[in-house]
């Protein structure tokens, strides 16, 4: 069986990786995240498991320090002659340490940047075909939505259709969460919030987006507010739960904390006019959170 190694610096991608693995007959994934590499022994074990891999992908979050034992892994894989793809953020080291052809590197990067189960699956198929000699077909990278609605009971549902399932006699609460969590199917905490709201007699309206998106074709939290949370100037929700980690005051971004600004009160949430509650999430795994006495980090 052809083997592909995959390291991801965050656990956010593990949901889509796990689902992709279930679709890959004849392709075995060796997967680790930063939380799996507690010491050098763990790093060495990961590399040992990859010594006969068709290719290895190191999917970093920023620079080299987002992977424990990075230099050892790169040097050892180079010695073994294993094709290596390093995906970093903005640093030349990733290009330098990547050993596959530039065109292949760029295609793999596009799979990873677009993300989601379908792109992880076909990234692995591409690697297995091009570097493992596996007779398998693969699709080009697929563009996924950058904003939309989600509900655990209605996969792939659209905004209007989800609202049609609501009881008009019940309050409606929006649940804002990051597009990347929807893309990689990291939605258990969203599901839990939806279930909790519904058990208390409310309609749950989970919405994903990039809160400060400024790229063409992407809509931000202000657009979501104006188009999905307001109708004829009136709110269609009674409250919002937001798990975004940064300020939603879009026109105040970049302002010094000591400067109240000229328009601190004139932000798009004022147009909505309903309570917005900040929910607290953590990048740590549940097991690490439960075994720690330091609280949420």
Each predicted region: which residue ranges?
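An N-terminal assembly and electron-transfer interface module characteristic of large anaerobic redox
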Residues: 1-297
């Amino acid at each position: 069986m052809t083997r592909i190694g995959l390291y991801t610096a965050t656990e956010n991608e593990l949901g889509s990786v796990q689902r992709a693995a279930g679709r890959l007959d004849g392709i075995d994934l060796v997967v680790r995240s930063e939380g799996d590499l507690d010491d050098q022994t763990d790093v060495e074990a990961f590399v040992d498991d990859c010594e006969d891999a068709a290719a290895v992908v190191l999917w970093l979050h920023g620079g080299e320090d987002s992977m424990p034992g990075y230099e050892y892994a790169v040097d050892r894989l180079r010695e073994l002659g294993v094709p290596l793809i390093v995906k970093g953020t903005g640093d030349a080291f990733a290009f330098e340490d990547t050993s596959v052809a530039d065109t292949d590197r760029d295609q793999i990067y596009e799979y990873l940047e677009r993300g989601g189960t379908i792109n992880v699956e076909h990234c692995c198929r591409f690697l297995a075909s091009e570097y493992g000699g596996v007779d398998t077909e693969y699709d080009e990278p697929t563009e996924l939505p950058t904003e939309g609605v989600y509900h655990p009971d209605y996969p792939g549902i659209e905004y209007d259709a989800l609202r049609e399932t609501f009881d008009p006699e019940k309050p409606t609460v929006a649940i804002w969460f990051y597009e990347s969590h929807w893309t990689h199917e990291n939605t258990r905490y969203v599901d839990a919030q939806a279930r909790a709201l519904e058990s208390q007699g409310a309609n749950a309206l989970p919405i994903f987006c990039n809160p400060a998106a400024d790229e063409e074709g992407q809509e931000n939290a202000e657009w979501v507010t104006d188009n999905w949370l307001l109708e004829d100037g009136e709110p269609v929700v009674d409250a919002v739960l937001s798990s975004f980690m940064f300020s939603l005051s879009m026109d105040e971004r970049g302002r010094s904390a000591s400067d109240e600004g000229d328009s601190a009160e004139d932000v798009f949430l004022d147009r909505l006019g309903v309570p917005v509650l900040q929910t607290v999430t953590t990048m740590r795994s549940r097991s690490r959170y439960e075994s720690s006495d330091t609280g949420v980090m």
